[in-house]
């Protein structure tokens, strides 16, 4: 058909007679209506086009028109005539109703209903996007096709165009916008509006903050890199603070500013010369001086010159402050002890070392140079530096040693080390030539020290206890206040009885006690149950991020529950969300799905809303549940030329005779251009018609959409698909966005977590995983680790980031101040304080401190050596007060040349007296003699006997033997040779020594230490050690007396019988025949000759029991001297039995004592005990010995060895 303007008629050809219609379009946009009403206001807006054409017209595609419109709007041009833009200033509701009307424009006609060409409507749903959506309408008169779309204005986003985001970088925010309108904070900014700067990592936000990223500006009263240090009270000297403007004093300090020293004595030790310091008042003290000293600090002696403080001949003058020394020429200093340095001009050449002397100097030259100033090259081989070598070859500026096999080093003094950790239990490996030897510590033995003999070797006694070795174990001698098998039990009166309750252990302190409480109790005596919040004033941060004392109990808004919930704090820092109606989930982030059960009927699409739902009905249905089919027969679509039947979204006309077509308006054809809608093809069947619908449509006239665009459902993650012909829209659930709901909304943008917390993004929720030490929903709260009172009683807890620090009171230590510092007393020695457990050396003795008691070895160190000088004043300056330097006996120099040494002696105290002296023959159970033989070539020049004796006294073995008794070691040149030194060893006092075992073990220990060669360079030259000790043997006449008595009794009876028999026989022979008398010797009586004991001495019988105990001198030679061939022992006869004669001779001398002498080679020591034979050996026949040759015991050192 054709649309004709005015009252024009159509021509026979079907066109308009006068003029066609001037068509333009009006558009009305209003809220969604299940049943569209064309009347009423256009609540969303309206628009109209200019005249677009006449009967039929076609406009360019909407996409090109839209692009052209945007281009013209930018250039200021006119809008495309076919484009209608309806702006709105509200959130797009997504559902809408669109009414489109085609009108005929005629200036000559008053507008009325007749001018309306066609009206169509569409109710549906559409999301904002750039794509166009096509709509097809087939009305009663006209057929319309148009495209629609909804676009958000610039800087508006989301499905409702109500999310505003405009990028900015100013005072009001620092962010950009993503494609979904989410604010993306720039680096260094956080918060909802990206206005909060990200402070420096670790910055304490309770005491500081920042205005620019990376900053940490402290609040008033706080300081430090992270604003975690409080500012102390101004002027606070020796104190600290936990809160600002406080001054908590350190130990021993007091006063408002902690500047008053409460223990001046302990901090400064002002008193000297043994004065006792007393704390009088803060910053004040008093010194109690010993006799002979005055002054505030006991620094001034009463008779300052009495001790002759001026050295080197200086004269002493007492002054008010003490003394002054007037020094002689060449000396200076307060005590005239500073010599003029003649070495200032560096007179020594060739790298020699200059030693300043009085009025001169001495050059100590390198080994390859000699002369007064080291200007001459020396023959290094003259000093025999090569120890284990074939020969020494002198070189220019040096020498070369041709070493023997097995040795190396410049002097062939290094033995190839065969020690590789074989010795156990701390044993010392001694390297030998092609071998090794383990020197075991006390208590261990075996080749590798693998056998334990001494139970105290592992030091089992604790806290200063002294271990005593027993046969079957050990015993600990505990210090005062300790007991138990290992001195581990404190028995001080503070803890007896135990004041600590609830199973706590008591520790004794110096003036108090300390209870180590279990976890559930606290207080002085562990009697107070430990509360979670001591005192009830808890400042625990609750799970919602608020302090419990800062708000009323109940629900509080918090970002953790989102915009649809309220946070409720639970015990233990937890929380719970109370959700608004229609929401559920841990964080109230899930909108309850009210579309469960599919309430919409007849294919309606259910749209979930907050606590409600809405049904989007397909064409042909309406109502809240899409259960109402509107009557499509209204108004009269059959034009009163037939009967109308209502269908779903359609109608059917049964036309009267002569009328055809869908609306009964034609008499010729069943089909026209508008019979089938939405592009359907009409087929005329004479009396009826049939529509072939395109894809996506169905129905008799293709008016029902199949909604095939939502099959399969393109919307994911629970999105609802709303189809409209060949297009669709997705209604996404909260937390999802995008055309098909594939993008999870980033709930972590902008950054919601503080203090380095990590944000975990969920679906419409987020969670902050806080860094260690922080808590709360957004990690802005520093956890107060001190709330649980982790520090022990009496300690102060200081909260820190991710931890705490306990400030301990005096006497306590440990991370929680739970460990007790055992108070011990120091030891004083020669004016020096030594703490408990420390060790030091005094002269030749070793000492250790045990709770105020000095435990020192008791070795008599001898007189102090001094250099003899022609000036008498210089002699006394080298010796302690009260002693004088006197010349020693001649012959003390072992390797000349030696300095002119003397010794400091005094009349009081006198050295201990002992009969055990070197170069004498005295030996008893408290006397041993050691004879040390030296290799003269290895002894350094200037070595004296006193130096060797000092080295032996300083041996650890010597000190260990002198723990309980005074040990005397006296040395002298031996008479046996020029390179031997004799050492006499004895204890003082000797009256309570039971036997000789102590002196023997001491001598053996000293010999073993000397053989190690590791203590002194002098002992490296020792080649042989000879040991002489005494063994007290038992009486040898115990079995001799009864045996001899039995023998003599038998002989006497036999003689009596024989005499009687022989007398009778002779008498009978005289009477019978009187034969001549036989005067020949009867040899059978030879065995009856009297037997004399060769060891009998006048006045003592071998058979008697009244004689004293036999004392046996054992002679042991480990390197025996050779005997000349044919050498015989003294006596009237020698039968060639040299061994027996020698033994008889030894037995015949003295009163039964046997001298035991051992010559010990340095490399190995053997002991071969030679006990006296039994009674049989004493009665054995042997050569007669001239008893006149026997000397007294005092003359015998070792028989046959002198």
From Swiss-Prot:
Bilayer-spanning residue ranges: 1038-1058
Protein's gene: Jag2
Biased composition (Basic and acidic residues): 1070-1080, 1147-1159, 1185-1202
GO BP of this protein: auditory receptor cell fate commitment; cell differentiation; cell fate determination; embryonic limb morphogenesis; epithelial cell apoptotic process involved in palatal shelf morphogenesis; gamma-delta T cell differentiation; in utero embryonic development; male gonad development
Domain DSL intervals: 150-194
Membrane topology: Single-pass type I membrane protein
Role this protein plays: Putative Notch ligand involved in the mediation of Notch signaling. May have a role in neurogenesis in the peripheral nervous system, limb development and in the adult brain.
Name this protein carries in UniProt: Protein jagged-2
Signal peptide limits: none
One of the Pfam families matching this protein, by short name: hEGF
Residue span(s) of domain EGF-like: 195-228, 229-259, 261-299, 301-337, 339-375, 377-413, 415-450, 452-488, 490-527, 529-589, 591-627, 629-665, 667-703, 706-742, 744-780, 782-818
Location of Phosphoserine modifications: 1080
All ranges on the Cytoplasmic side of the membrane: 1059-1202
Highest taxon above the source species: Eukaryota
Positions annotated as glycosylated: 107, 525, 574, 707, 1015
PANTHER family the UniProt entry points to: CYTOCHROME C OXIDASE POLYPEPTIDE VIC-2 (PTHR12916), DELTA-LIKE PROTEIN (PTHR12916:SF12)
Entry-linked SMART domains: DSL, EGF, EGF_CA, VWC_out
Region ranges (Disordered): 1070-1202
